[in-house]
UniProtKB/Swiss-Prot annotation:
Disulfide bonds: none
Species per Swiss-Prot/TrEMBL record: Thermus thermophilus (strain ATCC BAA-163 / DSM 7039 / HB27)
Keywords, comma-separated and alphabetical: 2Fe-2S, Amino-acid biosynthesis, Branched-chain amino acid biosynthesis, Iron, Iron-sulfur, Lyase, Magnesium, Metal-binding
GO MF assignments: 2 iron, 2 sulfur cluster binding; dihydroxy-acid dehydratase activity; magnesium ion binding
Modified sites of kind N6-carboxylysine: K121
Name of the protein in question: Dihydroxy-acid dehydratase
SUPFAM superfamilies hit by this protein: IlvD/EDD N-terminal domain-like, LeuD/IlvD-like
Matching Pfam families: ILV_EDD_C, ILVD_EDD_N
Record-linked PROSITE patterns: ILVD_EDD_1, ILVD_EDD_2
Gene that encodes the chain: ilvD
Amino acid sequence: MRSDQIKKGLKQAPARAMLRAVGVGDEDFGRPFVGVVNTFTDGMPCNFHLRELAQHLKAGLREAGLFPFEFGAPAISDGISMGTPGMRASLVSREVIADSVELIAQGYLYDGMVGLSACDKTIPGTAMGVIRSGVPGMVLYGGTIAPGEWQGRKLTIVEVFEAVGQRAAGKISEEELLEIERRAIPGPGACGGQYTANTMAMALEALGLSPVGYNAIPAVHPEKERATKEAGKILAWAIAHDWKPKDFLTRKSFLNAVAAVAATGGSTNAVLHLLALAKEAGVELSLDDFDQISRKTPVIADLRPWGTYTAWELYEAGGTALVFKRLLEAGLLFGEEKTLTGRTLAEEVERAYREQEGQKVVFPVEKALKPHGGLVVLKGNLAPQGAVLKLAGTERTSFEGPARVFDSEEAAMEKVLKGEIRPGDVVVIRYVGPKGAPGMPEMLSVTSAIVGEGLGPEVALLTDGRFSGGTRGLMIGHIAPEAFVGGPIALLEEGDRIRIDVEGRRLEVLLPEEELERRRARWRPRPPAFTHGLFARYAALVRQADEGAVLEDPL
């Protein structure tokens, strides 16, 4: 065992003495040692329950003959930091979490690793770290929140964001906004639609890095405790067979994950995160793969933010296994791909499959809700390296209008709340990319305000930042290259005509190349937002969105 370097032999007596102090007994030195990265925090609901869930996980690992050691990693709440300078920390935390997992795995020479995650960046962060650690491992998702309820309708956090715009437009009262705020989040768990956390949790099951069916179990559902304990047996098998993530993560595995995202109208953040995970696994994956898979994969799940149902209701209907079953029946998944259990994806789906009688959440492919998947990649003179649109959140496939140009989200939000954005406008928020912000913050506050004011179908938004999984409407993000490095979005001026052609996959400013060249000659780079510390290092090393906003390797 790898951990024998820590715990066996004459010279390791001091190490054993220290391990005895934390509860390792004589018989335990013969067990595989496992690191459990727990992203618990009592600062937000998504990860609030992970302290308790970790106890069930560790109990299951011990029952399976392993010895677990728990450690922490940071967790940033997108919902709390949204629309503030704190949002810069969100995507940065993905890299810090991955580094933390790698650091602990290497520092303690553990034989296996488990990532216990919940909020948006903790899922890809722990997954990147588990893959990078080079030992058998898996990622477990803490589960979705239960929906809130007000006046007979189910609520998620997105309804609160949109209520801000409704209040600004005078559509609801201050008292109604307060009631929505009070009732939307009834307890622990991640945001309750097919937003980023639930999208990535499903993607990890499709990849084979999480047990099929586990991640769909809601945070406070009684089944969660039993399934968490059972997961210990899976890791014990993987360690016994030296079955590591890089042994089963293939290009087809990643295409399966992309198809799952497309079929459920999932978050555009999945593009960034799956590109980053593919890099860790040494697998070729590009923006074009997302577009090609989405073209042939219909939307078959009626999930929020664009649809009707919450993630809790998806679990009741049959969960992720039901989605995968439908896609397998239509030949839209590679069922022969192996998973962390050593069995194929198709075998795992059959073991986990169930369907609630009369459910209306997941449809057969021949009765799909939309003929094409939810992700569209646009290119053109505004986005030479690509931009991403979630088509499942909008019915419009073309748009042309004048640019309303803002160099920060705050400036755009001010105009939206003052009612100064008009139907037909194209709101442009730039200098908020991976390097520019830095950290590529999400624009949910401003996009929700636009929708809340009733302008969703009539206003487009472009940004070199990104969007929450809760965003809906004609919102195009991940524009690459970003403004900070001199991408064409930096050259836009107020009133420039912008054309969006979804069918043709084009995003263009209607200016001659000569004019763009004149503006490019006048453009000057901006000073960095940070010159010292973590954010300065991140901005110096991060790559563009079309590469997953991963950090540069030195070689």
